[in-house]
Regions:
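Walker A/P-loop phosphate-binding motif and the immediately C-terminal alpha-helix
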Residues: 26-74
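Pre-Walker A adenine-sensing motif
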Residues: 15-23
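Flexible beta-alpha connector loops of hexameric P-loop NTPases
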Residues: 85-92, 119-125, 173-175
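Phosphate-binding loop that captures ATP/GTP phosphates
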Residues: 55-112
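Conserved catalytic-core segment of NTP-binding enzymes
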Residues: 124, 128-230, 236
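Receiver (REC) domain switch/output surface
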Residues: 1-13
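C-terminal boundary of histidine-terminating zinc-finger modules
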Residues: 84, 237-239
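Short coil/turn connectors at secondary-structure junctions
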Residues: 25-28, 56-58, 108, 196, ...
Length: 239
């Protein structure tokens, strides 16, 4: 026991996820990364989890690995008793029944493991423990989605190392594009093929003269696989 305690997303030949039974016994791991805060990374993670469940046939666990703000619990309106850091520290003692019992289930059907509210809770939690926990979870769920911090750190590195697919979220502002370009270059140097990196462009503002899809692709040297258009009503509803 534990001690102390969507439509299937596709692009030309590359997919965000595939059923685990198609390739291996453990589930697919998807890391959602974005190298700037406020661009829609967590919104992408939560909606992706709900969409995959809605398609049917797959169990989904969303793990909040954001070491700074961790907003998954707020966005999915769940109240945690246990969080990632507590569970990961006891990763060696994980038991399937105990692990499932501490997970929260969102009304969409997706399971959630939130981040701690206090960033200091991460201090005694190593990336190796996080990876061990994620591997354990992938043995229980068809799809494990990792929501990550908005800046590159050891946790982002650990998440992308484990992931079968890396969903890179970017916006059209210059700092986001610059950081996204560097991230994609880094992933390539780590051996990631272009088909394993899925870029989602979110238009967060209705600004005349904003970079086009073609401009973004040129800036980051990678195709934009999905675009989310600006919607004023959605922006108002989220405030």
């Amino acid at each position: 026991q534990m001690n102390n305690i969507a439509e299937r997303a596709r692009r030309k030949g590359a997919v965000v996820y595939a059923p685990a039974s198609d390739a291996r016994d453990s589930g697919r791991v998807i890391a959602v990364v974005g190298q700037k805060g406020g661009i829609g990374k967590t919104t992408t993670s939560t909606n992706l989890a709900a969409a995959i469940v809605a398609e049917g046939g797959n169990t989904v666990l969303l793990i909040d690995l954001d070491t700074r703000f961790g907003d998954v619990a707020v966005m999915m309106d769940v109240k945690p008793d246990y969080t990632v850091s507590e569970i990961a520290r006891d990763a060696t003692y994980l038991d399937r029944d105990a692990f499932r019992s501490i997970l929260l289930r969102h009304e969409s059907g997706a399971f959630v493991l939130p981040a701690p509210r206090d960033y200091r809770s991460w201090l005694n939690c190593s990336t190796e423990q996080l990876q061990e926990m994620v591997r354990f979870a992938a043995g229980m769920f068809d799809v494990v989605i990792l929501d990550t911090p908005g800046t590159f750190n050891d946790v982002v590195g650990a998440a992308t190392e484990l992931a079968d697919r890396v969903v890179v979220v970017t916006s059209t502002d210059l700092t986001s594009l610059k950081n996204t370009s560097l991230l994609i270059e880094h992933l390539g140097l780590k051996g990631r093929s272009a088909s394993e990196v899925v870029v989602t462009l979110i238009h967060g503002h209705d600004v005349a003269g904003a970079p086009s899809k073609a401009d973004v692709e040129y800036a980051i040297s990678h195709p934009v696989d999905y675009e989310v258009p600006f919607d004023r009503n959605v922006r108002k509803a989220s405030q």
